[in-house]
Amino acid sequence: MAVQQNKSTRSKRGMRRSHNALPITQISVDKVSKEIHRRHYITMNGFYRGVKMIEK
């Protein structure tokens, strides 16, 4: 089993964990349907960048 030699400080622990944060999801509004959606994703109505991609 691995056992640490010395106690890690709160500062070093925080620096190590600084890359663990989840990125904030980017949100956009479609030009045509005015629907809120994630960036680079199709809307629930089937629009992507103002063009109807999927017929429901």
UniProtKB/Swiss-Prot annotation:
Gene Ontology CC annotations of this record: large ribosomal subunit
Region (Disordered): 1-23
Coiled coil: none
GO molecular function: structural constituent of ribosome
Keywords: Ribonucleoprotein, Ribosomal protein
Keyword Ribonucleoprotein appears in the UniProt entry: yes
Biased composition (Basic residues): 9-19
HAMAP family attached to this UniProt entry: Ribosomal_bL32
NCBIfam families documented for this protein: rpmF_bact
Family: Belongs to the bacterial ribosomal protein bL32 family.
Designated name of the protein: Large ribosomal subunit protein bL32
Organism of origin: Blochmanniella floridana
